[in-house]
């Protein structure tokens, strides 16, 4: 809510028409529009204001273990969300300011759209704005710093252009085994052991697809993100 209010205030000072759209209390999406001089196409500059949670605060030594407090170290600014996507938000705001200061008149409308829900699934952000509010644009540029670069060792991760995102799906697999005493594994079918076999198979599973001609398109992949095992109450 604080970030939404700050962005809204900046755009209002820049003379934009600003609207707030809430799907959840105290989490307004911001849409700022500097009107163009004609009936040209609409270009949306899109970004998100929510931040991925911190799960290992003890590793944030650059911020004195306070990941939500921005800390400058040399020419770098460290904080949870500094690149994903506070830095991008700042660039978008400065780009809007530059157009205004230069007195550039566009034939079409620019639309600056800052959403509150991207890290989860977009239900209360872009999806809500398009399906419930009816926000539309002819073209869109999303300042998301995770465009696929092919070789992360070259330091180009997130610094690439991508024409689209392939999307993702979450799949939960449950394996059931046969319970037995720990000294008699020969009499059981251990679901944990079987899951290890499944994971090994998923790691080498081939994907049958045609390589897209669009630059930066993320290739298909499988990522194991969580494993739970055992029965509640067991020692």
PLM regions and their residue ranges:
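Fold-level recognition of mixed alpha/beta catalytic cores in primary-metabolism enzymes, strongest
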Residues: 83-203
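Single conserved hydrophobic/aromatic residue that forms the stacking wall/gate
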Residues: 1-7, 11
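Short beta-strand-to-loop junctions in surface cap/lid or active-site-entrance loops
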Residues: 30-39
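Short acidic/glycine-enriched loop/turn segments that link adjacent beta-strands
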Residues: 25-28
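Conserved, helical-rich catalytic subdomain that frames metal- and/or nucleotide-binding sites
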Residues: 194, 205-215
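Active-site metal-coordination/substrate-binding segment of hydrolases
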Residues: 40-111
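A structural supersecondary motif
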Residues: 215-235
């Amino acid at each position: 809510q604080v970030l939404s209010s700050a962005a809204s205030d900046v755009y209002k000072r820049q003379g934009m028409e600003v609207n707030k759209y809430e799907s959840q209390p105290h989490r307004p999406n911001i849409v700022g529009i500097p009107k163009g001089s004609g009936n040209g196409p609409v270009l949306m500059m899109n970004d998100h204001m929510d931040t991925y949670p911190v799960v290992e605060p003890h590793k944030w030594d650059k911020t004195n273990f306070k990941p939500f407090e921005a800390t400058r170290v040399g020419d770098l600014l460290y904080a949870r969300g500094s690149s994903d996507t506070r830095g991008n938000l700042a660039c978008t705001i400065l780009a809007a300011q530059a157009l205004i200061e230069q007195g550039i008149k566009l034939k079409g409308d620019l639309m600056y759209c800052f959403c509150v829900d991207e890290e989860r699934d977009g239900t209360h952000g872009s999806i809500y704005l398009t399906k419930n509010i009816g926000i539309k644009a002819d073209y869109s540029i999303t300042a998301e710093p995770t465009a696929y670069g092919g070789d992360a060792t070259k330091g180009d991760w997130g610094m690439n252009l991508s024409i689209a995102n392939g999307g993702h799906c979450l799949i939960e697999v449950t394996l059931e085994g046969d319970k037995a005493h720990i000294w008699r594994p020969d009499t059981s079918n251990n679901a944990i052991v079987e899951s290890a076999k499944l994971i090994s198979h998923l790691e080498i599973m081939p994907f049958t697809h045609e390589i897209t001609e669009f630059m930066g398109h993320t290739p298909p992949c499988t990522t194991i993100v969580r494993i739970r095992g055992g029965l509640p109450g067991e020692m």
